[in-house]
Each structure stands twice: as C-alpha cells, then as structure tokens.
Amino acid sequence: MADESKDTTHFGYRTVAKDEKADMVADVFHSVAAKYDLMNDLMSFGIHRVWKRFTIDCSGVRRGQRVLDLAGGTGDLTAKFSRLVGETGEVVLADINSSMLKVGREKLRNKGIIGNVNYVQANAEALPFPDNYFDCITIAFGLRNVTEKENALASMFRVLKPGGRLLVLEFSKPQFEPLSKAYDAYSFHILPRIGEVVAKDAGSYRYLAESIRMHPDQETLKQMMADVGFENTTYHNLTGGIVALHRGFKF
C-alpha cells in the first residue's frame, strides 16, 4: 500500500486529505446507486452471487439471531439473512450512503421483505450500536472504501457479542500471475467502458479498479483483524484470489 501521512490517505491511486475521502467516496456511490445491481452482474458475470452465497453459508447465522449487514447497499445479503433469522431475529442493513440505502430499502420492500429488517445510515468507523449487540456482522465489498479501516474493524469488534463473528468479503490479490495480468487488463480497460455505457460514469469504475489495488492483501487484512482483537481469523480465496472471504471471532 502507498505511504500515507497522518492527514492523508488514498482515493484510488490519488493521495487526498483524510477528511475529503468520505465525501469523494459518497459521490461515487450516489452516482452508481441506481445501476449498482446491474453493474455487479455485468462486471462479475454474475459470479458475485456465488461469492455472497458462500458468505451466507460461512456465517453460521441461525433463527432468532441479530445480524448487521454493514455497507449493505442494495441488500443482497440482508435478503438472505432475513429468511435465516426468521420472525424472532433481526437484520440491520447499514450503509453510510443515503442513495444506496434508499435503493436497498425499496428493493427489499418490493420483494415483501419487511418486519425483521431495519435500516440505519451509519459510518463503519463509529457504529451507533451498543456494545456486544450483534451475533454476526458482514461487510461485503465495503471495507476498501473506508478511510480508517482499523477504526472500522475495532468498531465492529465492539458491537459483536462474545462468540460473534465478522465476515469480510472483499476484492483481494489474485494468486496466479496469468490471472493477475488478465484481471488488470479487464479492470483498467474494459470495466470503465462498461461503466460509461451502462452507468454513464467511467470515472467511478476507474476508482473501483484502483481502490481494489490499494486494499490490503489477504495476509495483511488477516493481521489487521487480529490486531483489533479478532481470534481464529482465517480466509478463503475465491476465484483465484480475485475475492477473499475473511472470518474472525470475538471471544
């Protein structure tokens, strides 16, 4: 990762003031919210659904539990968790971006998913929930956009119950050189063109590609989770390491 002073951070490949990054990321997601689901399907050829299904399967969520779907966006994971926890459980879909939260709320309500789902606009670095509150937290394709990732992980640790688990699904580092080269070519040349045609926004998808390259790799993120208190932290490489699922427990 690039060197950063205490007052600056990265926005893709650019160095920006830390207090500016959140607004810049917000602009990206305000821009792409309406086409977010369609772009996910196009960008990943639908494979994101397999990655999310694997995350659900690894979550261990059961009936009656309380789940936080952080950076939950358009609610793919929330929809699945809602069925798993049942009427006696609760799922909180939290996102810092009001446009994404609006799309997610409308999508789930149109599917009849109501009653055990609540919506909260929240910053991952300072979660507005009590200590020891959730049985499980997921953050899918959201952590790389957070300015202070260590603060966010510590905040998630705080609101987890003892015995609770965090699952981080995020783009990561491909494990094979030929795959890495092909992935770079796709990310930097094809992906922005898809964004321009479908979402009328090549810049946001150029940022997406750059933000993935600046995100901590598998071992670094594993250590970051351990540093804030998570135990038994492991990760699974998916699609050759293009994506990784990290899981850690609070004891």
UniProtKB/Swiss-Prot annotation:
Keywords tagged on the record: Menaquinone biosynthesis, Methyltransferase, S-adenosyl-L-methionine, Transferase, Ubiquinone biosynthesis
Gene Ontology MF term list: 2-methoxy-6-polyprenyl-1,4-benzoquinol methyltransferase activity; demethylmenaquinone methyltransferase activity
Catalyzed chemical reaction(s): a 2-demethylmenaquinol + S-adenosyl-L-methionine = a menaquinol + S-adenosyl-L-homocysteine + H(+); a 2-methoxy-6-(all-trans-polyprenyl)benzene-1,4-diol + S-adenosyl-L-methionine = a 5-methoxy-2-methyl-3-(all-trans-polyprenyl)benzene-1,4-diol + S-adenosyl-L-homocysteine + H(+)
Chain coiled-coil ranges: none
Binding site for S-adenosyl-L-methionine: 74, 95, 123-124
Organism (species): Erwinia tasmaniensis (strain DSM 17950 / CFBP 7177 / CIP 109463 / NCPPB 4357 / Et1/99)
One Pfam match: Ubie_methyltran
Example GO BP: aerobic respiration
Superkingdom field: Bacteria
Pathway(s) per entry: Quinol/quinone metabolism; menaquinone biosynthesis; menaquinol from 1,4-dihydroxy-2-naphthoate: step 2/2; Cofactor biosynthesis; ubiquinone biosynthesis
Protein name as catalogued: Ubiquinone/menaquinone biosynthesis C-methyltransferase UbiE
Keyword Methyltransferase attached: yes
UniProt EC number: 2.1.1.163, 2.1.1.201
Protein family: Belongs to the class I-like SAM-binding methyltransferase superfamily. MenG/UbiE family.
Function as written in the Swiss-Prot or TrEMBL entry: Methyltransferase required for the conversion of demethylmenaquinol (DMKH2) to menaquinol (MKH2) and the conversion of 2-polyprenyl-6-methoxy-1,4-benzoquinol (DDMQH2) to 2-polyprenyl-3-methyl-6-methoxy-1,4-benzoquinol (DMQH2).
Disulfide bridge map: none
